[in-house]
């Protein structure tokens, strides 16, 4: 079974308070999501392997460490996942960015795939799937399915808030995928929204309804 990691860092929790607040405007909401994504990326990449190289400082030669050639891929689930990309690229500028477009059918709450664009070397990359909200889990599970069908073998899921129901769905469908969240919320309501949640992340990021 994939592990669930809930980040309790004070900076993350502070920023999530204002992400949740309905009075937070589009500009500030966008900036906060970007910042939280950066902070989460710092933790989610903690297990990247290192290798030793030799460099020359202004003073002497030195042996030091760099990331051991791992190829990372970021996969935002359109459209809300786009809000998390830049925050991670600030720390990992060499990461490739693919896109998976999914929307949730308002009647069935099931995900419908409408767009997929991935790096050409899928099998060689470690992927991080990005979605601010893990609600029913359907979209995240489908995005992971889409990656696996195209050859991806190492996948992590990163969300800002999650409902227990969504976590359960992803863990049952993809027991090899670890889930990283900034907050584990109470439940889903009858409309499939996370409670207390943060509303519709896509609408709040892009100022739409």
Swiss-Prot record:
Alphabetical list of CDD domains matching this protein: PRTases_typeI
Keywords, ordered alphabetically: Allosteric enzyme, Glycosyltransferase, GTP-binding, Magnesium, Nucleotide-binding, Transferase
Activity regulation info: Allosterically activated by GTP.
Residues annotated for 5-phospho-alpha-D-ribose 1-diphosphate binding in this entry: 79, 104, 131-139, 200
SUPFAM superfamilies: PRTase-like
Entry-linked Pfam families: UPRTase
Residues bound to uracil: 194, 199-201
Cofactor comment: Binds 1 Mg(2+) ion per subunit. The magnesium is bound as Mg-PRPP.
Cofactor: Mg(2+)
Molecular functions (GO terms): GTP binding; magnesium ion binding; uracil phosphoribosyltransferase activity
One GO term (biological process): uracil salvage
UniProt superkingdom: Bacteria
EC number of the protein: 2.4.2.9
Catalytic activity: UMP + diphosphate = 5-phospho-alpha-D-ribose 1-diphosphate + uracil
Top-level EC class: transferase
HAMAP family (UniProt xref): Upp_B
Homology family: Belongs to the UPRTase family.
Protein name stated in the entry: Uracil phosphoribosyltransferase
Taxonomic classification: Bacteria, Bacillati, Bacillota, Bacilli, Bacillales
